[in-house]
Design a protein with these regions (language model features):
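Alpha-helical transmembrane segments of multi-pass small-molecule/ion transporters
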Residues: 1-324
Length: 324
């Protein structure tokens, strides 16, 4: 168990700490990271997501429908809870609340999920990990981007009252959502899904070219996350502890309950629950940095979730292995 967790978590911490100390010691500029954000979010991760989905046989994807539904519900529930909590209890604006909600609601299955589930359950679990990435990329991610886009355009102050004002606000949200779907991080997994469903095969030279770009996703994303976090103060406060409780304890518990409610098979229940138990993802922090929205709660919660994750992941691995 210790070796499995070490193999999965030590590389994650190494990447985060490399970026963190590189920024802290001024080896890298932690204030002007837009170019690195563009590389990670518009090239590396989209290539990785596209290949993961496109390379999955259609029959295997069909078997993931129930797991995908469970993951979508799990992500949406914690996203909504986190957004409402930070918006009305912590008094954050809509942009900052969406960044925190995505950080807590979308686990780091990109960097942690693949090695951890492969170590615990074998290579057969990687399809569910790819599904989890696709679900997060086409649900809570575009919602966050829509909120950030709307805030950037100043749509929070839409004029009008009554039905006309509400209609205008809804129209602005819809336009922002459509605009967010133009981003590679959103449409790449959808394109991969289309390739898989159509049984299309990429030429080997294109596959290898995309694989080269996609292979840079994990390391560059972790370094970028650490770099962004290094520009902020890490604070352990009451809301940080609440954030960790929501992510590391509540989300996997919700996942387990939903899996049982929809009668998901034991194997998929284990996968979905353990994916939900992963520490915070980096999409929220990176999206926020791209839109100049950097709530301390997001970065503090992210770091704290990894520190607590060493113990909480071990506990959830034991729990899921006793299911059934």
């Amino acid at each position: 168990m210790t070796k499995v967790l070490a193999n999965a978590l030590v590389p994650i911490f190494a990447g985060l700490l490399l970026g963190y100390f590189a920024g802290l010691w001024r080896r890298m500029d932690n204030q002007n990271v837009r170019t690195l954000i563009t590389f990670v979010m518009s090239f590396a991760i989209p290539c990785s997501l596209f290949l993961a989905i496109a390379s999955t046989p259609r029959a295997a994807l069909r078997e993931q429908a129930a797991a995908g539904l469970a993951l979508a519900i799990v992500y949406a529930v914690l996203y909504a809870v986190s957004f409402v909590w930070t918006r009305f209890r912590e008094n954050l604006n809509a942009s900052d609340s969406s960044v925190v909600a995505l950080t807590l609601g979308f686990p780091n299955s990109a960097a942690v999920g693949l090695p951890l589930l492969a170590s615990v359950f074998g290579s057969r679990a990687t399809v569910t990990v790819a599904t989890s990435l696709a679900i997060g990329s086409i649900t809570v991610s575009p919602i966050t981007l829509a909120i950030l886009e709307r805030s950037r355009r100043g749509s929070a102050g839409v004029s009008g009252t009554g039905l006309s004002g509400k209609s205008s606000a809804l129209r602005q949200i819809a336009l922002s959502l459509i605009h967010s779907c133009k981003r590679p991080i959103v449409w790449a997994p959808l394109l991969g899904l289309a390739f898989s469903c159509a049984d299309l095969t990429l030429p080997s030279f294109i596959h290898r070219s995309l694989a080269v770009m996609g292979s840079a996703a994990d390391g560059s994303a972790l370094v970028l996350t650490g770099l962004v976090v290094s520009a902020q103060k890490f604070e352990i406060r009451g809301n940080t502890l609440i954030a960790v409780l929501l992510k590391n304890a509540l989300q996997p518990a919700i996942a387990l309950g939903i899996c049982m409610l929809i009668h998901l098979n034991i194997e998929q229940t284990r996968y979905v629950t353990l994916i939900s138990a992963m520490p915070c993802g980096f999409f929220g922090v990176v999206f926020g940095r791209d839109f100049d929205s950097n709530p301390k709660l997001a970065s503090s919660g992210l770091i704290a979730s990894y520190l607590v994750g060493v113990g909480s992941l071990a506990a959830w691995i034991v729990i899921v292995n006793h299911i059934g």
